[in-house]
Amino acid sequence: MRFKELDGLARRGETPEERAYHDRRRAELRAALYAGIAIRDAREEAGLSQTELAARIGIAQSALSRIEAGRANLTLGTLQRVTDALGLPLKLGVGSHEVAIPAA
């Protein structure tokens, strides 16, 4: 389900529980989209095609395409493999707390 579909559901008069669910789902979709954009930008800066990066991290090009489009549930393991393949640290933050995991 995409943002527009969720927004349409929110306008139909929903219970507080349904609204909370849709708000959480929108936040999850937004996070996946932002992560995908960051991966795409880093891949392009490295001069790699989707096919090349996908091969380096052991997934299909189509799976990487879904990740970059924000349409995949990205695991920390996959994210670590991406940053390792690009020679970049993985930075994770929760509120004011941030940790940088160096590339392998």
Give names to the regions the model predicted.
Residues 57-73:
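Recognition helix of helix-turn-helix/homeodomain-like DNA-binding domains
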Residues 77-93:
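DNA major-groove recognition helix of helix-turn-helix/homeodomain DNA-binding modules
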Residues 1-37, 99-104:
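N-terminal flexible/basic segments that precede or flank functional cores
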Residues 71, 86, 97-99:
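The DNA-recognition helices of helix-turn-helix-type DNA-binding domains
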Residues 32, 57, 92-93:
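Short amphipathic alpha-helix starts
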Residues 3-4, 9, 37-54, 81:
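Short basic helix-loop element that most often maps to the first helix and adjoining turn
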